[in-house]
């Protein structure tokens, strides 16, 4: 285990409690409702910028370096709020990340039951994905990165966490897939 004794910000409990609160709350529909909802739950979006705008979907990210949480991203499709995501704990020592991810996974099991879908890679290349649904919302968690293995890509460990409105997320994915098919047909 690492000797780095910096506090974990946000803590596993803070992340789990916020996600639990958001999943059961009334999901915002419009940009105005989303802004109020984020503010009510302490999600900082100052300095937000549009990073993708195509096929009726927009992706936004807040890059506020003064926020206690990492940058938050969110998606809007056809003017409806779909969901949000974080990349948590980037920069922490590699030997700390798996335990944090497993602790967060355990909290999500308490919140939403066992994952509907889960994939794991054990051993030196340890990582996992887990997916839950509860009340029309999804929680999608990935442990990325890890130790360098010969001939393999290495990235700094990070936990990717997305929380979406299931039906709106499905519509956004279908709209994007349909647009890609149409673009492919339009090419000579």
Task: List PLM regions with ranges.
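Active-site beta-strand termini and strand-to-loop segments that position acidic
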Residues: 131-137
């Amino acid at each position: 285990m690492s000797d780095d004794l910096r506090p974990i910000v946000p803590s596993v409990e803070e992340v789990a409690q916020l996600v639990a609160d958001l999943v059961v709350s009334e999901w915002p529909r419009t940009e105005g409702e989303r802004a109020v909802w984020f503010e009510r739950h302490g999600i900082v979006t100052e300095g937000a910028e549009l990073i993708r705008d195509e096929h009726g979907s927009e992706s936004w990210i807040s890059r506020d370096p003064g926020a206690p949480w990492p940058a938050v991203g969110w998606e809007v499709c056809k003017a409806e709020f779909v969901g949000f995501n974080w990349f948590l704990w980037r920069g922490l020592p590699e030997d700390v990340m798996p335990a944090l991810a497993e602790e967060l996974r355990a909290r999500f099991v308490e919140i939403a039951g066992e994952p509907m879908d889960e994939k794991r890679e054990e051993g030196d290349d340890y990582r996992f994905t887990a997916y839950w649904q509860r009340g029309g919302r999804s929680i999608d968690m990935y442990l990325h990165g890890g130790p360098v293995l010969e001939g393999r890509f290495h990235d700094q460990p990070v936990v990717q966490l997305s929380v979406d409105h299931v039906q709106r997320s499905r519509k956004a994915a279908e709209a994007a897939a349909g647009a890609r098919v149409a673009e492919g047909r339009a090419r000579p």
